[in-house]
Amino acid sequence: MFPIFDPVALGLYIVGYIFMLIIAATIAPKVAKSISGRFTLYGAMALTAVLVVLTTAFIIYLFVTVALPHMGAYGLSFLLGLIFFVVLMNIITYFASPYLINLSYGARPDPRLQQIVDEVAARLGAPFKLKAVVVDGPPNAFAYGNFLTGRYVAVTSSMLALTDRRELEAVIGHEIGHHLHRDNAIMLLFGILPSIVYYLGVTAVHMAMASSGNRGGNPAILAAVGIAAVIVSFLIQLLVLAFSRLREYYADTAGAKAAGKEAMQFALAKIHKFYFANPEAHEVVRDSKFRALFIYALVNAVANPFVSVTRSDLEEIKRSSYSVFQEIFSTHPPIPKRLKFLDELQF
């Protein structure tokens, strides 16, 4: 979500962000701990999706029943126009982003990688053709594209050097899993919802401030609903991030099916081990507009092809600590949790 650049929007954004920080630091870890292990992966995804949709629907219902009567004669038209604009901008981004990614990362076809992608896709029963491309940069991989541009699986040249054949197949399986699960389209849809709620809130506050009070409306009610919407939009954003992390576990199951749980674990462990030794490597990907696509979300450096991981290394990584606070704001789960998840995975 990006605030409109005016003092009111900036102030609301700060209030919402502070609220999100408080939730992430206090309530969210306790809730996550209390429900940990109580749901299957599919149950957790369904529950989180329902919470996102119901919370968004409640705010829209609140606008229609409480705020709309105080928005003047053109309130409904403005409301629908705003929602249409937010949805349209996101759809345009969805269809344009593959071209931007290809340009940004210098994507180029690779016959050897294409052969591996085709083999893994057949193993997973993918019903569509996938385009395999090699890109420059750190050891990473990502899935992008759509039915118009084609569906891509991108692997960096340094990832090719870092992994052996089975580990590479697991990484590719993870990315094909994103395509099979329609994650790009699903996360586009869910990502739109907090943006809609946020901009509805900002607009309501603006209209309340501009109201002269002679139209029969109550600016105070309109402002209160607007502020509440902005705050709740940040809560919805936290839920969307949680949903994204669950989709990553879901994609890991595809990687494990493609090449085995151990291959998926060792691929993740190699990435983790390399970047743990290069803490400065996190900055570039953290600033990337496409970081949510990566198999590993906070990495960037020149990979050392001689990184190796032993079974004892793997077990040590599983036991390593991670920041719960940082996890709540991430699109990807911590590697130790993903390794433990794969341990418990059964086919």
Curated annotation (Swiss-Prot):
It comes from the Archaea. Its cofactor is Zn(2+). The keyword Zinc applies. GO terms for cellular component: plasma membrane. The chain crosses the membrane at residues 8-28, 44-64, 76-96, 141-163, 185-205, 221-241. GO terms for molecular function: metalloendopeptidase activity; zinc ion binding. Keywords: Cell membrane, Hydrolase, Membrane, Metal-binding, Metalloprotease, Protease, Transmembrane, Transmembrane helix, Zinc. The active site is at E175. Binds 1 zinc ion per subunit. It is found in: Cell membrane. InterPro entries: HtpX_protease, Pept_M48_protease_HtpX, Peptidase_M48. Its EC number is 3.4.24.-. Zn(2+) binds at H174, H178, E248. It is an enzyme of class 3 (hydrolase). It is a multi-pass membrane protein. Its main location: membrane. One of its GO terms (biological process) is proteolysis. It holds the Pfam family Peptidase_M48. Belongs to the peptidase M48B family. This is Protease HtpX homolog. It comes from Pyrobaculum aerophilum (strain ATCC 51768 / DSM 7523 / JCM 9630 / CIP 104966 / NBRC 100827 / IM2).
